Amino acid sequence: VVIVVMRTADGTPVFPVTKRPSKMRAHPGQFALPGGSVDPGESSEQAAVRELSEELGVDVPESKIIGRLDDYVTRSGFVIRPFVMWSGEDIGGLVPNPDEVAQVYAVTSEELDVDSRFVTIAESPNPVIQWPFRTSLIHAPTGAVIYQFREVLNGRHTRIDKLEQPVFAWR
């Protein structure tokens, strides 16, 4: 997945978070960062660049990757490898793919810097993370990756491997 730092028309730094279409087979209606599977012969970095282009119409070269966050292993066994990229492009120029993106949100630094919630559940010894975003809660894995991005920006070395997904995402 990719957190790509862009800007608004007035120059405010933001990054896009998407909401998946309700008709999607996997995780319909959930919040997500651009990303997907690595194709044969492709590196994780190349996949991140390709998925960003396919989902949002943003063509950012691999050289614009400025960092990597911790891998997050989902309950279903997928390994999510998050990258942080710098684009600097106007987020208003996005061209979302309607097959993969129902809506795009521009996340500001003020929205990013909201304290996450950590909820105890009977099914796991690890806390479920809930990142409050506008009128919603974004859970792991997306919420965990965004949480770590916030922590890194604040100079904290916080790991996310012990942050749980909600039970509804365990499939």
List each language-model region with its residue ranges.
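Intrinsically disordered, low-complexity, charge-dense segments enriched in Lys/Arg
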Residues: 141-144
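Unchanged
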Residues: 37-134, 138, 151-152, 156-171
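Short, amphipathic alpha-helical segments that act as regulatory/interfacial helices
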Residues: 146-150
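N-terminal strand-loop-strand
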Residues: 1-33
